[in-house]
Amino acid sequence: MAIRKEEESREEQSNSFLLDALYCEEEKWDDEGEEVEENSSLSSSSSPFVVLQQDLFWEDEDLVTLFSKEEEQGLSCLDDVYLSTDRKEAVGWILRVNAHYGFSTLAAVLAITYLDKFICSYSLQRDKPWMLQLVSVACLSLAAKVEETQVPLLLDFQVEETKYVFEAKTIQRMELLILSTLEWKMHLITPISFVDHIIRRLGLKNNAHWDFLNKCHRLLLSVISDSRFVGYLPSVVAAATMMRIIEQVDPFDPLSYQTNLLGVLNLTKEKVKTCYDLILQLPVDRIGLQIQIQSSKKRKSHDSSSSLNSPSCVIDANPFNSDESSNDSWSASSCNPPTSSSSPQQQPPLKKMRGAEENEKKKPILHLPWAIVATP
């Protein structure tokens, strides 16, 4: 036994010697730390907006992919004054709800992109004002499912001064209609795609880069609220937005940075000038600032809470009445909300509310038929 223990101890010592041979001395650790600190200070002291070409070659393929996927939407239908006004109201509601739940800027941009592409591909009737609100709820719900990790219930989306309250099944069927209209392409190229690409190339080395990113997102929230920007390519909107932010951050020498940016994006000043001039005409981005501040506050509050409260106007949602054999489309009279009379001015009937106080805040709940997803 003693001999065996002695052999085991010798084997352990030999193994320890082998492990010791793998270690190396690091006497210059302090010097290396000083060198790294010096290099970081030099990099942070240099201009935060210079994009070095040698750092960008490896991401050129990503940029080419973005350009190949972006498509000119050409939404000329928004030239309609009435539709443009309705869109402004719908976009405002989307931004308010987006901030209410603390969703990201990308979620808001995606929702509005879905909205624009849908309303220009599908004929909405002006005598049914609830249609656009239903589309807005469905677009924001889809965008939240794509971008967010915590998504409210469909009934819970209907907050922030909503005029109508739709049942969950109604919203789901509108989601299906939007998905089929967009050919199930949910990860669309948006201006944020190009802004985030440039920021990723900068590497977010210092606070200036973060500030640049936040300012771009804030301005984009104001830009997408204006229907005049709908027809521009996402890359053009992104370039014009970043050029404007560069001008605000460094008013003394913005031209060189703007030229560098356009060179990276392979865009000419002439192609961006019209969009850039429109941005200059926008008022101070109070909308974007307010929405972004509210969004950040709400995101913090919702991160600490695992449940989302329903709006006070939402009550029991029973399956909406419908005719299974109906093949009517949007334009059919059966799509009208049920009323107690034939008068088109009368609102749909209300379901019973919980509590006496909620009776004072009743909102019309629309019961739409199954034919809501039928294409015209």
Curated annotation (Swiss-Prot):
CDD domains: CYCLIN_AtCycD-like_rpt1, CYCLIN_AtCycD-like_rpt2. GO terms for biological process: cell division; G1/S transition of mitotic cell cycle; guard mother cell differentiation; response to cytokinin; response to sucrose; seed development. Transmembrane segments: none annotated. Changing S343A: Alteration of the cell cycle regulatory activity. Residues 354-363 have a biased composition (Basic and acidic residues). Keywords: Cell cycle, Cell division, Cyclin, Mitosis. Phosphorylated. Highly expressed in roots and at lower levels in leaves and flowers. Expressed in vegetative shoot meristem and inflorescence. Induction: By cytokinin. Induction by cytokinin is blocked by auxin, but not by cycloheximide. Induced by sucrose and glucose. Induced by 24-epi-brassinolide. Down-regulated by sucrose starvation. It comes from the Eukaryota. GO terms for cellular component: nucleus. Residues 321-349 have a biased composition (Low complexity). SMART domains: CYCLIN, Cyclin_C. Residues 298-376 are annotated as: Disordered. Interacts with the C-terminal domain of CDKA-1. Interacts with KRP1/ICK1. Interacts with KRP6. Plants overexpressing CYCD3-1 show extensive leaf curling, disorganized meristems, increased leaf number, late flowering and delayed senescence. CYCD3-1 is a highly unstable protein whose proteolysis is mediated by a proteasome-dependent pathway, and whose levels are highly dependent on the rate of protein synthesis. Belongs to the cyclin family. Cyclin D subfamily. Involved in the control of the cell cycle at the G1/S (start) transition. Activates the G1/S phase transition in response to cytokinin hormone signal, but declines in response to sucrose starvation leading to G1 arrest. Involved in the induction of mitotic cell division. Plays an important role in the switch from cell proliferation to the final stages of differentiation during plant development. May not be involved in the activation of cell cycle in the root apical meristem (RAM) in the early phase of seed germination. This is Cyclin-D3-1. It comes from Arabidopsis thaliana (Mouse-ear cress). The lineage of its organism: Eukaryota, Viridiplantae, Streptophyta, Embryophyta, Tracheophyta.
